[in-house]
UniProtKB/Swiss-Prot annotation:
Record's subunit section: Homodimer.
Name of the encoding gene: dxs
Cofactor(s) demanded: Mg(2+); thiamine diphosphate
EC number: 2.2.1.7
InterPro entries the record matches: Dxylulose-5-P_synthase (IPR005477), THDP-binding (IPR029061), Transketo_C/PFOR_II (IPR009014), Transketolase-like_Pyr-bd (IPR005475), Transketolase_BS (IPR020826), Transketolase_C (IPR033248)
Disulfide bonding pattern of the chain: none
Source organism of the structure: Pseudomonas syringae pv. tomato (strain ATCC BAA-871 / DC3000)
Binding positions (Mg(2+)): 159, 188
Pathway annotation: Metabolic intermediate biosynthesis; 1-deoxy-D-xylulose 5-phosphate biosynthesis; 1-deoxy-D-xylulose 5-phosphate from D-glyceraldehyde 3-phosphate and pyruvate: step 1/1
Protein name, UniProt field: 1-deoxy-D-xylulose-5-phosphate synthase
GO BP annotations, alphabetical order: 1-deoxy-D-xylulose 5-phosphate biosynthetic process; isopentenyl diphosphate biosynthetic process, methylerythritol 4-phosphate pathway; terpenoid biosynthetic process; thiamine biosynthetic process
Length: 631
């Protein structure tokens, strides 16, 4: 069984077997008897590596043995291995030639946080969002068959990701085309937060049967032995009355279901995978793992150790005076929703499996009957809110910008067309840093402002966030407030829940010649630049409805209008300004500053903003360049 470590090593560990096995070809030269020692070395290397850089942590620890077994049994990269989401892919990266570069993990020009096709031939499909792996592996399996290839396609998906409808769409389709593929359910009872819903309960009931394997003839040919009784007992729920054969759900869909087996038992994993490798058609293997396995603190607190920051040096200087920390924007939202829930009993909070990330823990504890975690099901979350709004509730959907993309049709068809009172609290808007382009909130202003009837707001600091959340909540019809990851400028936050006038911006600095129209948290940078250029700075607040009167007035009194946003320039807030000027037949020089028409690669947020010219230096340079052109 795996060794359990109690501390993250600060010095690179001695790993003689891993030194020989940093590619799958090297791994396959090892004897099976050496693999359990290799697993301990790989786990220790992962602890050391992530301790140096920070990053996703618990999920990778839980799939050490599975990762070794997959690369040992299958002919990767010819056999296609697809990791769902990618939080668990660090051991895979270490074993596929990237060990020496793991010190650059999540850093500018370094190893990406998630599998990337451009990074390695072993990363057969780029991921980051949940529940895509089965569809991707199915597509690969079909294409391979059309090309006359016998290669295997393998999807590794967690029980959390299996709560999303897309996964079941693929599970339903694969048997129809008799796809030669394997789906591995990594069942650790976790996604990021604990799983919820009927499917999670169903999987737990599967674990409650200790004798099911002997009841299935097919399993006898595949499983070398059952997992330890103590492991099953630990995960047991009361046996579901009348459930004779676990896995019925998957078998009824047309899959050959095997399991569950112990995902930390390497001999069993290898023997089972070898047998399943030669089976034709859609195969489904259910493995039971523990998130954070092998690191004692993570086993106790898998949510807290989902990801970690890098270790501070032992000799780092200790500041005598504590720095006053600004509140996180998500924290401001978390306080606001509790305050508004106290004031209005109609408020309900909805999140797709991001209770901790969206800062809804306090709300869920204080108002449990009004809190709804729908699991990884963004489409359902939006339409659930629509249904609640139809009956007089006031739903607040707390969701990351990048994940709202997955519920866009529901936002349009089910909420906006019916003009329902739903507030979208859109977290992680703009560039998010080390997680890279799959998690950036680059497009929400563009895809929201084209929807008729919606109010779209961009707060510039913590106090503005609270005000605009109240404004959106009290508005009749759909509304959206987008705010970034991290902390604000430590603005004084007013305790009231008063709204502001919809569609009205605020002049924050009066200057001349140049006017900077700010949509969001770049207000601080704009004010720095304005002091140098004696420019006017306007906090626009609203992308939709746009303060057209203020834009018209400003255009008449300034030589150059500059729009500033942390959103794609194409179709964003700046485009809204230019569209208005065109409709009003106002000829004016306009400079749009925002995210360029590329995917901005992972780095620290400040580095990403500088790369896009959205720091104070870049903003000033762009304005001076335009002023030079217009004379």
């Amino acid at each position: 069984m795996p060794t359990t470590f109690k501390e993250i090593p600060r010095e690179r560990p001695v790993t003689p077997l891993l030194d020989q096995a940093d590619t799958p070809h090297g791994l396959r030269r090892l004897g099976e008897a050496e693999l359990e020692t290799l697993a301990d070395e790989l786990r220790l290397e992962l602890l050391y590596s992530v301790g140096q850089t920070g990053g996703h942590f618990g999920a990778g620890l839980g799939v050490i043995e599975l990762t070794i077994a997959l690369h040992y049994v299958f002919d990767t990269p010819d056999d296609r291995l697809v990791w769902d989401v990618g939080h668990q892919a660090y051991p895979h990266k270490i074993l596929t030639g990237r060990r020496a570069r793991m010190s650059t993990l999540r850093q500018k020009d370094g190893v990406a946080a998630f599998p990337r096709r451009s990074e390695s031939e072993y990363d057969t499909f780029g991921v980051g969002h949940s529940s895509t792996s089965i569809s991707a592996a199915l597509g690969m399996a079909i294409a391979s068959r059309l090309q006359g290839s016998e290669r295997k396609s393998i999807a590794v998906i967690g029980d959390g990701a299996l709560t999303a409808g897309m996964a079941f769409e693929a599970l339903n389709h694969a048997p129809e085309v008799a796809a030669n593929m394997l789906v591995i359910l990594n069942d650790n009872d976790m996604s990021i937060s604990r799983n919820v819903g009927g499917l999670s309960n169903y999987l737990a009931k599967i674990l409650s049967s200790r004798t099911y394997t002997s009841m299935r003839e097919g399993s006898k040919k595949v499983l070398s032995r059952l997992p330890g009784a103590w492991e099953i007992a630990r995960r047991t729920e009361e046996y579901a009355k009348g459930m004779l054969v676990p896995g019925t759900l998957f078998e009824e869909l047309g899959w050959n279901y095997i399991g569950p087996i112990d995902g930390h038992d390497l001999p069993t994993l290898i023997a089972t995978l070898r047998n399943m490798r030669d089976l034709k058609g859609p195969q489904f293997l259910h493995v039971v793992t523990k998130k954070g396995k092998g690191f004692a603190p993570a086993e106790v607190d898998p949510i807290g150790y989902h990801a970690i920051t890098k270790l501070e040096p032992l000799n780092a200087p200790v500041s005598v005076q504590k720095k006053v920390s600004s509140p996180k924007y998500s924290g401001v939202f978390g306080q606001w929703i509790c305050d508004m829930a106290e004031a209005d009993s109609r408020l309900v909070g909805i999140t797709p499996a991001m209770k901790e990330g969206s800062d809804l823990v306090d709300f869920s504890e204080r108002f449990p009957e009004r809190y709804f975690d729908v699991a990884i099901a963004e489409q359902h979350a939006v339409t659930l809110a629509a249904g609640m709004a139809c009956e007089g509730s006031k739903p607040v959907v707390a969701i990351y910008s990048t994940f709202l993309q997955r519920g866009y049709d529901q936002l349009v068809h089910d909420v906006a067309v019916q003009n329902l009172d739903v507030l979208f609290a859109i977290d992680r808007a703009g560039l998010v840093g080390e997680d890279g382009p799959t998690h950036a909130g680059s497009f929400d202003l563009s895809y929201l402002r084209c929807i008729p009837g919606i109010v779209v707001m961009t707060p510039s600091d913590e106090n503005e966030l609270r005000k605009l959340l109240s404004t959106g909540y009290l508005h009749t019809g759909p509304a959206a407030v987008r705010y970034p990851r991290g902390t604000g400028p430590n603005a004084v936050i007013e305790a009231n829940l008063d709204p502001v006038e919809i569609g009205k911006g605020v002049v924050r600095r009066q200057g001349q010649g140049v006017a900077i129209l700010v949509f969001g948290v770049q207000l601080a940078e704009a004010l720095v630049v304005a002091e140098k250029l004696d420019a006017t700075v306007i906090d626009m607040r609203f992308v939709k409805p746009l303060d057209e009167a203020l834009v018209r007035e400003t255009a008449a009194s300034h030589e150059l209008l500059v729009t500033l946003e942390e959103n794609a320039v194409m179709g964003g807030a700046g485009a809204a300004v230019s569209e208005f000027l065109a409709r009003a037949n106002i000829l004016k020089s306009v400079l749009h500053l925002g995210l360029p028409d590329v995917y901005v690669e992972h780095a620290k947020p400040a580095q990403m903003l500088a790369e896009c010219g959205l720091d104070a230096e870049g903003i000033e340079a762009a304005i001076n360049e335009r002023l030079a052109l217009i004379g």
